[in-house]
Amino acid sequence: MSGGAGVPDLPQIDASGMKVGIVASTWHSTICDALLDGALKVTESANVSEPTVVRVLGAIEIPVVAQALAADHEAVIALGVVIRGQTPHFDYVCDAVTQGLTRVSLDASTPVANGVLTTNTEEQALDRAGLPGSAEDKGAQAAAAALSTALTLQGLRGRS
């Protein structure tokens, strides 16, 4: 599945036996539910049985739950959406979420895929949510990134 210029096709992944956590916000439910659906389709096609799914209200809550998931999962997928408003709040939330997820990933040595959309408009978010007519499926892309990175790390850690 390719969404546009420069977007690679999603790889075929076999993550059988991998413990995967997904944290998804509920704000802008149509978008977040679609992102979650895309991620779940990828985990299912990669033979991940029963990923742990945790829902939180907003994007700012995602990093702390991702941190808890990273403690006992091999891959974490973070999903949500922040849409620019008329105040600087957008910038603060986007920065906090991005830095928080990066810190969790590095501190836990666990891939945490950032599937939190940061858009100027709701239309841009809908176009990336994996809905019918959307140009991209960022939930699926985040899941593929988390799983493929976890497999890469398994390979690196398995070397003597």
From Swiss-Prot:
Catalytic activity: (2S)-2-hydroxy-3-oxobutyl phosphate + 5-amino-6-(D-ribitylamino)uracil = 6,7-dimethyl-8-(1-D-ribityl)lumazine + phosphate + 2 H2O + H(+)
Active site: 89
First-level EC class: transferase
Sequence positions that bind (2S)-2-hydroxy-3-oxobutyl phosphate: 86-87, 128
A single BP term in Gene Ontology: riboflavin biosynthetic process
Stored CDD domains: Lumazine_synthase-I (cd09209)
Family, similarity comment: Belongs to the DMRL synthase family.
Any one GO molecular-function label of the UniProt entry: 6,7-dimethyl-8-ribityllumazine synthase activity
Keyword terms: Riboflavin biosynthesis, Transferase
Coiled coil: none
Organism: Mycobacterium sp. (strain KMS)
Record note on quaternary structure: Homopentamer.
Protein name, UniProt field: 6,7-dimethyl-8-ribityllumazine synthase
Described function: Catalyzes the formation of 6,7-dimethyl-8-ribityllumazine by condensation of 5-amino-6-(D-ribitylamino)uracil with 3,4-dihydroxy-2-butanone 4-phosphate. This is the penultimate step in the biosynthesis of riboflavin.
GO cellular component: a single term: cytosol
InterPro entries found in the cross-reference section: LS, LS/RS, LS/RS_sf
Pfam families: DMRL_synthase (PF00885)
